[in-house]
Structure formats: structure tokens, C-alpha cells
Amino acid sequence: MNEGAITNAILIAGPTASGKSALAIRMAHETGGFIVNTDSMQVYDVLDLLTARPNKADLAAAEHHLYGHVAPSMSYSTGRWLDDVADLLTQPAMKHRTPIFVGGTGLYFRALLGGLSQMPEVPGDVRAYWRGRMEMDGPENLHRLLSERDPEMAATLQPFDSQRIVRALEVFEGTGKSLLVWQQTKGQALVDDHSARKIVLLPDRTWLSERIARRFALMWDNGAIDEVKALLVLDLDPALPAMKAIGVREITAFLQGSMSREEAIERSVIATRQYAKRQSTWFRNQLDDSWCTHANSDDAFAQLTTTK
């Protein structure tokens, strides 16, 4: 057992639209517990619909935390999320209650169980500098520069892997240490891996595909366009995570007249299906045998309520 780690947690992972949120609410009723967002996009304010955050009825049905608490103008790291979770779990009102972590971000679950390196926060000006250098000089030139400064890290990266090259350079400059050093420093588990009840929902692909299409059509009809309008008014950097939420680019193109309603919906649905496929692949390949896989939430609920 990890010293100080929560021993009564429930973890519910799965791709978008798989029925995780409804299952979490059922478990909150069953246990008297509270729900904790474990999805990197649902932390952002403004995009209630497009990130499929719990609606008013859901929020009234169970206690939810860490949803929509981050401004879309901010970048929000896994480390920041973990700090927020730690603060939440130490609140007196949360003691002796069951935390139910639900979401689709695999790295959040890994961090929760202590399997993610404690990555440093890099100053914004350092990040901006190296992203600017990448645009000007290209990945091969920066890979050569990384080879001079941090040859061991450079040896692990392909010369065309721009994102990881920039990350390695900014970490080296911002902290004075190689990214390899940080990657070898594992985090402290907040949830005990051995005692937690862990479920991953992996529905039938056809069922999930159809559900994604229906859900996005409802998003469109119920206010997704207004959400994107509100986001665009903020005049944010397109590179910010909130601006990359599925549907933002497509609805923006629709508002600008460069894409029809039908095409915007179709492209958003396709992008969501591709995202769900990537999530499913990650969960299949990265989660160990201690996670119980179910195709539907009813079977998962039955298992969770019979396994204490």
C-alpha cells in the first residue's frame, strides 16, 4: 500500500460518449461519494457542451468537482490537476467519503496512481521562446542544438519530432536538468493502486459511433454555436488547449461562412470518433490487468457494487 494514498477510490475510465458520467452518478448514489473530473478538456470554463461536461441535472444529482474551474486562456498541466486533486482530498468534508474519478484522460489516471513522472512547470516566456524558434528554425536544426546541450535526451528523439524536441529544450533551459532526469522521478500516488476499484468502459464500436453522432447533433442544437462565439470573443491564442476542443475549429469555420452546417457537423463527428478510437487504444494498451473492462455501464455497475 502506498503510504498516505486513498484506499477507497473508484476509477472509471473510457473513451468519450461511453457512458462514464452516468455510471459515476449511479456510483455516487450507491456510495454517498463525490465525483472528480479526470478529463483534461472538461476542466475549462465556457465549453460546457463541446467538452460534454455534466449538465445541470447531473450536477444536481451528485456532487461534482474540478469541472470548468480553469479559464480557457490558461494552459493546465497534469501536474496542476494532480495538485488540485490533492487539495480537494485533504478537505475535511471529503474525509471518509468515496472519491469517484471519471474521465477519458489516461495520463490523469496514471498520475493519480503514482505512475507519472513529476514534470516541472516551465516559465511561459521560456515556452514561448522555444516555440518561436521551432517555427523559425525547424525541428532538425533544434534537434542539433539539443544534441549539443542534452545529448542523451536528443538520442531518444527523432529529428522531425518537433513537439518533443521543443519540450526537451524548454525543460532543460527552464530547470537546468535534462528531461530524462525528470522522467525518471516518479510521482507520489494519491490513490492506492491495489485497493482502488478500477473500471474501463470500452463499448461496441458501432454503438459508440452512433452515440457520438447523436450527441454532437444535440450539442449543435442546444447551444454549441453560442459557446464558440463566446470563446472567439476572448481572442485567445489558437495554440491554447481550449481552442483545440473538438468542434471549435469546425464551428468557427461555419460562423465565418467557409463551411456548411452539414460539413461542420460531419467533420466534428469524424474527429470525435477518431479521438474515441485513440482513447480506446490507449486504455487497451496502457492499463494493466487490475482494471476490469466492460462493454456497458450496467455490467460495470454490477461489478462495482459487488466488489468492495
From Swiss-Prot:
Binding site for ATP: G14, P15, T16, A17, S18, G19, K20, S21
Catalysed conversion reaction: adenosine(37) in tRNA + dimethylallyl diphosphate = N(6)-dimethylallyladenosine(37) in tRNA + diphosphate
Signal sequence, start to end: none
Keyword Magnesium: yes
GO BP annotations, alphabetical order: tRNA modification
Enzyme class: transferase
EC code(s) of this entry: 2.5.1.75
Summary of the function given for this chain in its UniProt record: Catalyzes the transfer of a dimethylallyl group onto the adenine at position 37 in tRNAs that read codons beginning with uridine, leading to the formation of N6-(dimethylallyl)adenosine (i(6)A).
HAMAP family: IPP_trans (MF_00185)
Name of the protein: tRNA dimethylallyltransferase
Taxonomic source organism: Brucella anthropi (strain ATCC 49188 / DSM 6882 / CCUG 24695 / JCM 21032 / LMG 3331 / NBRC 15819 / NCTC 12168 / Alc 37)
Gene that specifies this protein: miaA
